[in-house]
A protein has these predicted regions:
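Short, conserved charged micro-motifs
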Residues: 275-277, 355-363, 411-420
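Beta-rich nucleic-acid/ligand-interaction surfaces
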Residues: 103-106, 347-350, 390
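Conserved PLP-enzyme active-site core in the AAT-like
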Residues: 2-36, 40-55, 61, 70-94, ...
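PLP-dependent enzyme catalytic core of the Aspartate aminotransferase-like
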Residues: 310, 374, 386-458
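Flexible glycine/proline-rich, aromatic-decorated loop/lid segments
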Residues: 137-140, 270-278, 298, 373-400
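Conserved glycine-rich beta-strand-loop-beta hairpin in the small C-terminal domain of fold type I
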Residues: 323-324, 338-349
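Acidic carboxylate-rich catalytic motifs and surrounding loops in phosphoryl-/glycosyl-chemistry enzymes
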Residues: 255, 341, 382-385
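Active-site loop ensemble at the mouth of alpha/beta enzyme cores that anchors a bound cofactor
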Residues: 323, 351-378, 392-399
Length: 458
């Protein structure tokens, strides 16, 4: 008999969860202005808002916390992290930052100017926000298959080379600071980019004299999918795949709170000394001295250990199979989700779930609120609220995909929790015809509004 799959870890510490009544949840979500970011954590039973910084660190990571060097300059923890980044990712120069958006802020302060054009694969919210804050434009060049949730394409994060070349041809290279490759592509459903596409994008960018930047938050999950899905990589280790991937970029930004499995931290990897020197000035201004950059020594130690653990096959297999378990459950219930299942989250297709709800009433946000009311499960909208308004017209931008993201924290929940999530969504799906009203905006920020938006029933 073939042995069943089991997790590659055992549980050493637990945290109690509190269940709540529907009446309590109705009160709490109304007080939160129907914005799930405004809920207190104790008002949530299963928290799938994000996989960023919410994972469980290992005993080895906890032991590294005790060995952190908190020297202001030249801490040994910095050099430990520097060596680990060089070993795994191959960057000679790096700058620590407190998280991924800080890495973007520092690097984009050097490279992105007004009226620039930044092509890539479905830039995530902070990436697009930092670009548009600088009065530049983000151009989505993702393949069309990414926008049909039922198409089984193994690499829906791929960049369409024709779309990319159109941007590169029609704009002077001085106006294109870099091409962004997001690994994996969060906004299209945690979808990976193939090694071949990475190579092709790099070659095309170099043809036009443009740099390549990897948004690397989930780079290890991307490497796992290359190993599993791309011909010729089945017998290659995750670390070797990662090293090959990073031959084809000039720079990287990293939110370490994802694939390095820490609660806080990020960094920039740079291959050109001059960009490193310019970025160092902004790092000192915004983050801190270049050998800590907003991170404590103990956090740098835990991050170095996490980079090792996060690029191990057994860990990645356990993590991604749990995400797939939830996807398969939902699929068996008829709930429409992005296929194939992503690396860090399941993305529910709100357009197919609530097709009769006017898109102006925020389908994915409505679905997120309904799931919370049903079972105390907190997901997040990846749709019209997140897309923000057009900077010129101030009209809503309606993305091709309107998704409810269920991001699974690493090494935190069991499959019993996945069963609860799936059953709750099935219950909402069974009564979807009764959901006829969504939300309207009461108050919003001019950029990245989804974090603080206030809503009321339409």
């Amino acid at each position: 008999m073939k042995l069943p799959f089991a997790e590659s870890y055992k549980i050493k510490v637990v945290e109690n969860l509190r269940k709540s009544s529907r009446e309590e949840r109705e009160k709490w979500i109304k007080e939160a202005k129907y914005n799930l970011f405004n809920l207190q954590s104790q008002q949530v039973f299963i928290d799938l808002l994000t996989d960023s910084g919410t994972g469980a660190m290992s005993d080895m990571q906890w032991s590294e916390l005790m060995k952190g060097d908190e020297s202001y300059a030249g801490a040994s923890s910095y050099y430990k992290l520097k060596e680990k980044i060089r070993e795994i990712l191959g960057f000679e120069y790096f700058l620590p930052t407190h998280q991924g958006r800080a890495a973007e802020n520092v690097l984009f302060s050097v490279l992105v100017k007004e009226n620039d054009v930044v092509p890539g694969n479905s830039h995530f919210d902070t990436t697009k926000g930092h670009i548009e804050f600088r009065k530049a434009s983000a151009v989505d060049c993702t393949i069309d298959e990414a926008f049909d949730t039922q198409v089984e394409h193994p690499f829906k994060g791929n960049i369409d080379l024709k779309k990319l070349e159109e941007v590169l041809k029609n704009n002077p290279k001085e106006k294109i600071p870099f091409v962004v490759v997001t690994l994996t592509c969060n906004s299209s459903g945690g979808q990976p980019v193939s090694m071949q596409n990475i190579k092709d994008v790099h070659q095309l960018a170099k043809k036009y004299g443009v740099r390549v930047l990897f948004d690397s938050a989930r780079f290890a999950e991307n490497a796992y999918f290359i190993k599993i899905r791309e011909e010729g990589y089945q017998n290659v280790s995750i670390k070797d795949i990662v090293r090959e991937m990073y031959q084809y970029t000039d720079m990287m930004t990293m939110s370490s709170k994802k694939d390095a499995i820490v609660n806080m931290g990020g960094f920039i990897g740079i291959k050109e000394e001059e960009i490193f020197r310019q970025a160092s000035t902004f790092n000192i201004m915004f983050e801190g001295f270049i050998t800590y950059g907003g991170m404590s020594g103990r956090d740098m130690n835990a991050l170095a250990q996490g980079l090792d653990e996060g690029t191990e096959f057994d860990y990645l297999e356990t993590r991604i199979k749990q995400v797939a378990y939830l996807g398969e459950k939902l699929d068996s219930y008829g709930v429409p989700v992005q296929k194939p299942y992503g690396g860090h989250a399941i993305f529910v297709d709100a357009n197919k779930f609530l097709p009769n709800l006017p898109r102006e009433e925020f389908r994915a946000q409505t679905l997120a609120v309904e799931l919370y009311l049903e079972a105390g499960v907190r997901g997040v909208e990846i749709g019209t609220l997140l897309a923000d308004r057009d900077p010129q017209t101030r009209e809503n931008r309606y993305p091709e995909l309107e998704l409810l993201r269920l991001a699974i924290p690493r090494r935190v929940y069991t499959n019993n929790h996945m069963d609860v999530i799936a059953a709750a969504l099935k219950n909402v799906y069974d009564r979807r015809s009764e959901i006829t009203k969504g939300f309207k905006i009461v108050r919003e920020a001019p950029i990245m509004r989804h974090f603080t938006v206030e809503l009321e029933r339409a």
